[in-house]
Regions:
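Alpha-helical, largely C-terminal catalytic domains
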Residues: 1-112
């Protein structure tokens, strides 16, 4: 897995190609359904797709907060305070959850 702060479009393209190669091995009904779901998630136009992307991003932050600070590089300190803000802004609940995760991040940094 490539950290968010190092991921470039070429990495996104590789991941997408690998996913579609795998999906093409499924029976045609499932292949079409999975492709449609993937497209819905990547377009982020539906509420479900927005929630999916927000939760995926928040989960990354929670896991990051669980890691030891010795594994963090300097740019992660700032990124962890702003990452996913744009992905939760459509929901008051997810915005509040993002704030709680940010507070955990700040508490972790202050313990250092």
């Amino acid at each position: 897995d490539i950290p968010t702060f190092d991921k470039e479009q070429v990495h996104e393209d590789i991941e997408e190609n690998l996913l579609f190669n795998w999906i093409e091995t499924l029976p045609s009904y499932y292949e079409e359904e999975m492709k449609a779901l993937y497209n819905e998630m990547s377009e982020r136009k539906t509420v479900e797709a927005k929630i999916y992307k927000a939760i995926d991003s928040l989960e990354a932050l929670i896991q990051h907060n669980a890691s030891d600070l010795s594994t963090w590089i300097p740019k992660e300190y700032k990124l962890n305070l702003t990452y996913a803000d744009d992905r939760v802004s459509f929901s008051e609940y997810l915005t509040a959850l993002r704030q709680a995760i940010r507070e955990d991040t700040l508490a972790k940094i202050e313990e250092k």
